[in-house]
Amino acid sequence: MESSADNTVPKQAESVFIREILENPLMPNLPPELAEIAKFVSFEGNVKPSIPVNWRLAESISALKAFEATFLNYLAHRKYGVRPSNVSINTDHATLFLMSPMLTQIEDRGEVRPFSPFDTLTAELFPNRDKHRANASLQRALITNIYKTKDGRFYHTHGGMNPEPTLQALGLPVEGEVQDTSEVVTDRIQQRLSKYDATHLDHLLNEEHRQAGTIVYSSAEYFASEHGQKNGKVGLYEVIRDPNSSQPAAWWPDHPNAPSSPKRPLAGLKVVDLTRAIAGPTITRSLAEMGASVMRVTSPDITDMSVLHQDLNWGKWNSWLRLDVESDRQKLRDLILDADVVVDSYRPGVMKRFGFGYDEVFNLVRDRSRGIIYVRENCYGWYGPWSHRSGWQQISDACCGISTSYGHAMGLEEPVTPALFNSDYCTGICGSTAVLDALVQRAEKGGSYRVDVSINYYNQWLVRSVGTYDEHTWTDLFRRHDAPVFRHYHSMQYMLPKLLTALYKFDGEILFQREFFGPFRSGALNTTFIQVRPIARFKDDAIELKYNVGTRGNGVDAPTWPADLRREIVRDEDEQGSGFRSGSGLGSGSIAD
């Protein structure tokens, strides 16, 4: 029987890290040296969990952060020949990683205040790229929710970044009424969905209208399904060597003004970021934190979640290209030809349609002296009948049984999607760690590599390897937070503020410690933000986690690699190699002194 001393969040996080990641039979190709390097990781933190959700979220994110830090130690050892560094993971600090967008503060006229996506300063710093007014009304916002169907099942609809196609597919008006309340709107949508059987609704939205949505399953139902069986054979990610690539073994080229070193292991690594939302941008932000130079590419013609840019655009230049224009496609090819990693998190098939799927990218670099890493991230996983579908964190949570279990844990006979962005952010860490894995493989074996990541892969692991709290721990956790009960029709916008209020009230001294936060300066915006610090703490800063450049909105930079990778803003003239000039804002993305 496990002793009470072992049943603490830090001890359980360590157990998950060792037994459920490093020794996981679904992760058979991990380097055997990781077992020894893992001994350099220590866990600390409060003995009890803080987030009133039955799933062991603190243990999950802490174990994944330990995995990422261990692989970074391994890469540094292989590339630079240095001894692994001691690293500590504070489980309370790691918990904040799952809610970091809501914790941002900003220095404004000498005062520090919470960052709000609704004030005028935010609009100046991060121009709104929500072209489809996704949350402009309750009608548009609440189409993303769980509703009951005609046959007594529950279904999670999702409006994505444009709710109109889903509303129109269901025969609902795209705008509500002026006097609408949340209750009125959820009742209106519920009445409409109660006319559909779940399977009919699933086909209507996904196959006929290509909109995100899923029947809400239990974990047992998911793993018994054809899709669950085909994807259930995958661990946290897959790294697959391109059989047609023959480039010799190689690291990335060293860069004169951003030399890679044990202290900044990924310095000089160039990453092309083709991502939106949360999971994909988390992959590239994590690589930037380790020293990589990231060029994010979006378009002035597509919508984006600007409310997340203060959190997820750190360490990235942000450029615009129109991929339906050949000259812009050539600019993207030029970026890729000088890069070592491409990350794609758009709906499966979108980038291939423009000529930038993994096969096309592998072929593009076939004649150069080194291969490339291509990361593709989706919701459902890359096998089975749902792999082509669009999806989001809430969809994956509902699909894999996370929502069903949480609702039952609160004493309900209905599913409830947990608040926070747990699955998204954790999937991002799986992706960044997989890139480290692939970089080492390329350095040892040569060639190009595809990395497959999905939110379902993470959630499968959460269900099978991490699990929920035992009855005693869950009862104590639930009651310590005044037993908060949410319903299936409660949206994220409703639950998140209530959850944060409870955390500040009951866990403030544990979670929101000053040492977990730091000032980050964006030279591009001439603004200082207070953000959650990097989670892994390497002893004596042997490995320094920070950002080379500050956050910003979309379209600020030219779509070209600058001659000086320390440039804060990339201008068109950088293509001619003008390099650094006075006032370019070196290193402004670092934690401010």
Swiss-Prot record:
Pathway: Secondary metabolite biosynthesis. GO terms for molecular function: acyltransferase activity. Residues 580-593 have a biased composition (Gly residues). Signal peptide: none annotated. The keyword Chloroplast does not apply. Belongs to the CoA-transferase III family. This is Acetyl-coenzyme A transferase nodX. Acetyl-coenzyme A transferase; part of the gene cluster that mediates the biosynthesis of the indole diterpenes nodulisporic acids (NA). Nodulisporic acid A (NAA) and its chemically modified derivatives are of particular significance because of their highly potent insecticidal activity against blood-feeding arthropods and lack of observable adverse effects on mammals, in particular the tremogenicity associated with the paspaline-derived IDTs is not observed. Its EC number is 2.-.-.-. It comes from Hypoxylon pulicicidum. Gene3D superfamilies: Crotonobetainyl-coa:carnitine coa-transferase, domain 1. It comes from the Eukaryota. Keywords: Acyltransferase, Transferase. Residues 572-593 are annotated as: Disordered.
